[in-house]
Amino acid sequence: VFNPNSGKAQLKNSLMKIIQIFSNADYEVTVYPTKAALDGYEKIKAAKGLYDIIVCSGGDGTLNEVVSAVITYGDEKVPIGYIPSGSTNDFAKSLGIPSDKIRAAYNVVSGESFSCDIGIINDRRYFNYVAAFGAFTDVAYETPQDLKNMFGHQAYVIEGAKRLLNLKAYKMKVTSSRLDIEDNFIYG
C-alpha cells in the first residue's frame, strides 16, 4: 500500500527497484496505490487474511491507516513493513528506519522485526506516533499536499504561522503537588 502523493511524490523514482527487492526475496508482490484518505485502510480491511506481510510507503498518515486497519480487523500478527516517503517521516526517524527508500526496503526484507507501542483513544481510534491536542494539532492534516510536495517540512511551519493571529487564550487553573497557577493560557 503506498501513497503516490506523499512527500514530494518521489516514491515513483524508486518503486520499480523496491518491487524488485521484494521479488528477489521471494515475495509475491501486490501493489496498491492509494487514491484518497482512508483508501489504504479500506484496502487492508478488504484483504484481511490474504497477506503474510503488509508493507506501506507514505507518510505518518499512511502508516497510521495501515496500522489501524491491521489491528481493527484482527490481523495483529501480520508484520508491517514501512518505507517512509512522507514530508517529514518523524515516526520512522524516531525508530531509526532509514529515510532512503531502497535501504528501507532492504531493511524490511532482511531486517529483524520489532514491536512498537500502539495507543488507542476512546476504544476506537488507534495511533502509532502522536495523539495531541491544542492550537496546532490540525496543522498536519490541514496542510495542502501541494505545499508539502513543494516545501517539505517547511509547509507545516507556514500552515502553523497562519494560525498565530487566531490563537485564543483560555483562563485555567493548574494545580499539582508542587504548584498552583491560575492565568490565561494558549494550548499549543
Predicted feature locations:
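Short amphipathic alpha-helical segments
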Residues: K12-S14, V67-V70, K93-L95
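ATP/NTP phosphate-donor binding region
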Residues: V1-S57, N64
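Gly/Ser-rich catalytic serine loop of serine hydrolases
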Residues: G59-D60, G86
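Short Gly/Thr/Asp-enriched flexible loops that form oxyanion-binding sites at enzyme active sites
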Residues: T62-D75
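Catalytic core of DAGKc-family lipid kinases
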Residues: A25, Y32-T34, Y73-G188
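Helix N-cap/beta->alpha junction signal
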Residues: G58-G59, A132
